[in-house]
């Protein structure tokens, strides 16, 4: 999807426009995201992660090039991040990997410049990140990657047990007035509790029980994440990134626990990691003598008229964004 940079940055002050086209690729465990920066325009693409990470990355790259009207040879630099970053290789384009924590921090900072504290909930882990609001650099972070509790995978299992689609789980939870008790310490215990609670609800043919279980699941996951935040400290300027940031139930319960509101982004922060990777790609390109020599020999010329006009939805494959991590 094509965006004007000024339309997706909260402050309207876009200072990340690179001199040459750069790309950030965030290859997640379930979904993969790409961002292409060129002048004052931002292109995004979102697809499910396939079996082979390189093929997924190449698919994203092709979609971004098709939408922007650019050629592969025009790209100055690519930065890869996310679960599959170490599997990627490019022989014809300068490429580096940057950790997903650094990229989520930089992406949140670029989209929401007041950000100081980030919650990132993905399919396999959750993170609490404190950043320097002046630079977007990570100051401190903690993560939960040892247990599925507090992750998108936990929510996915809950939705399956309740017999609903994952994107329905959040809205169903919002219908609850009395969240059911669900363990926040272990996903195995939580699953057992959900089965028992569901059985009682089914015996009573009680849709209210389903909503209460869904709300309890969200509260359980949110408490796990809240504990992570307590270890890094919570400062004003909260940002919520990752696929689970699209879940309205999780958004609400976290705000309740935190007694604070998340900043509302103009760009879906499922793209935080890939946006941050693209920003880092711009920095690497600017510092590279090899890249400078390439464009000195063949100056980059791009006409916005080359960008296809009717492709706004063509580059995003429809699938459940709430676990596109």
Report residues per predicted region.
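Glycine-rich phosphate-binding/hydrolytic loop that grips phosphoryl groups
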Residues: 106, 155-156, 160, 266-305
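Short glycine-rich, Thr/Ser-proximal phosphate-binding strand/loop in the N-terminal lobe
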Residues: 19-63, 138-145
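Gly/Thr-rich phosphate-binding beta-strand-loop-beta motif of the actin/hexokinase/Hsp70
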Residues: 8-42, 115-135, 325
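Acidic, glycine/GT-rich loop-and beta-edge segments that sit at the periphery of enzyme/chaperone cores
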Residues: 2-6, 283-325
């Amino acid at each position: 999807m094509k965006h004007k940079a000024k339309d997706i940055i909260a402050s309207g002050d876009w200072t990340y426009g690179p001199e040459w086209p750069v790309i950030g690729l965030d290859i997640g465990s379930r979904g993969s995201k790409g961002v292409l920066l060129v002048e004052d325009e931002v292109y995004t693409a979102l697809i499910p992660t396939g079996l082979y990470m390189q093929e997924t990355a190449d698919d994203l790259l092709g979609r971004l090039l098709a939408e922007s009207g650019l050629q592969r040879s025009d790209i100055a630099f690519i930065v890869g991040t996310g679960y599959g970053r170490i599997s990627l290789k490019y022989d014809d384009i300068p490429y580096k990997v940057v950790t997903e924590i650094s990229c989520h921090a930089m992406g949140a900072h670029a989209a929401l410049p007041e950000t100081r504290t980030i919650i990132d909930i993905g399919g396999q882990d959750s993170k609490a990140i404190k950043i320097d609001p002046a630079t977007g650099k990570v100051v401190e972070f903690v993560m939960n990657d040892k247990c599925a509790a507090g992750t998108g995978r936990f929510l996915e299992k809950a939705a399956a047990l309740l017999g609903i689609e994952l994107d329905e789980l959040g809205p169903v939870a919002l219908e609850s007035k009395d969240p059911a008790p669900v363990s926040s310490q272990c996903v195995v215990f939580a699953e057992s509790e959900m089965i028992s609670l569901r059985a009682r609800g089914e015996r009573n043919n009680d849709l209210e029980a389903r909503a209460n279980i869904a709300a309890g699941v969200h509260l359980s996951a949110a408490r796990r994440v809240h504990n992570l935040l307590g270890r890094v400290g919570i400062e004003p300027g909260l940002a919520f990134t990752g696929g689970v940031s699209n879940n309205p139930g999780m958004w609400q319960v976290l705000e309740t626990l935190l007694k604070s509101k998340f900043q509302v982004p103009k760009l879906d922060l499922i793209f935080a990691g890939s946006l941050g990777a693209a920003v880092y790609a711009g920095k690497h390109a600017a510092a590279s003598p090899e890249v400078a020599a390439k464009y000195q020999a063949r100056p980059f010329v791009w006409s916005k008229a080359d960008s296809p006009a009717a492709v706004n939805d063509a580059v995003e494959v429809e699938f459940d964004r709430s676990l596109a991590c």
